[in-house]
Amino acid sequence: MNQHLNGIPAHGGHLINRIATPAERQEFIEKAESLPKIQLDKRALSDLEMIAIGGFSPLNGFMDKDDYESVVVDMRLKNGLPWSIPVTLSVSEEVADSIKEGSWVGLSSPEGEFAGVLELTQKFHYNKAHEAINVYSTQEIKHPGVKVLYDAGPVNLAGPVWLLERHPHPLFPKYQIDPAESRKLFQEKNWKTIVGFQTRNPIHRAHEYIQKCALEVVDGLFLHPLVGATKSDDIPADVRMRCYEIMLEKYFPENRVMMAINPSAMRYAGPREAIFHALVRKNYGCTHFIVGRDHAGVGDYYGTYDAQYIFDEFEPRELDIVPMKFEHAFYCTRTQGMATSKTSPSTGEERIHLSGTKVREMLRRGELPPPEFSRPEVAAELAKAMKI
């Protein structure tokens, strides 16, 4: 398939495909009994999947030491290409000692199913504190990304991977659209400019506002909710997806929006993850990417607009995707509509600030989000799911 469908090259110039061919799959299955096995957790399995389908292009496997250290320190791969998040496979000392560099390793799902193969090219120890400070800007274990890091094994395994088979998503098969397919669909829709939107929350009025602002200047919106591993207090993916469907059916023009699931796991790395999310959407064929307040943030670890400022650390041609930076949107009681400080003269109590966190807090208290926060149909769906 043409890798430059809709004219937008993947990051690094080539859309990676590491899904085993039928012949390769048969060969791997025949070798399976003799291969050492590693059981992946949910995050590692989603990383394997994203590498295989090209979502993490140009990566064709888990990072080696040179790429890892370059990304941690400089937000670039060893060849100089921008990349802001380490993508690694961490194991215990015992597991690392049991396999040799140069060998083939079977990768199994958390349920024990044979999922893929790693050609082990390197094993290396890494400094968790160094990664935590550079990637997450903190070593505090209460940060969910740091906790995952410190819970992981001390040795990283590197090498190219193959995904044995692309299975339909168990919950959202109709929205499982891989990068090669999204590019083809954008071309069929004759969209030349596409803005990607990353979300792990139900769409509230502030999200709707910035999405529609972006839609005024591009051909299409690619709504790309994350359905991989998130924090335990995030709204479950099936609930969020029903809310997205309601929004698209009632409040967006059908021919201007496309939704697909993002199987990736959240890192909660704030500014660095904003770059990462933008590059992933570039691989899916987007030309633009929405960056709002505290993108991919958690708690108070990052400044409100740090995730926007970080784009200034790269030349636009290096990223080759345009960040659309939006201020914190609010409901303005004076103008009775959504606005930002750029468009509203209101002050203080005239501004009702919205966030996914506030919606989650209201639901946990048994309160229904008001119309200023959420469309009534979405609020009703959330209330039903939370059994208010």
From Swiss-Prot:
It is an enzyme of class 2 (transferase). Its EC number is 2.7.7.4. CDD domains: ATPS. InterPro entries: ATP-Sase_PUA-like_dom (IPR025980), PUA-like_sf (IPR015947), Rossmann-like_a/b/a_fold (IPR014729), SO4_adenylyltransferase_pro (IPR020792), Sulfurylase_cat_dom (IPR024951), Sulphate_adenylyltransferase (IPR002650). The keyword Cell division does not apply. GO terms for biological process: hydrogen sulfide biosynthetic process; sulfate assimilation. The keyword Glycoprotein does not apply. Belongs to the sulfate adenylyltransferase family. This is Sulfate adenylyltransferase. It comes from Trichodesmium erythraeum (strain IMS101). The gene is sat.
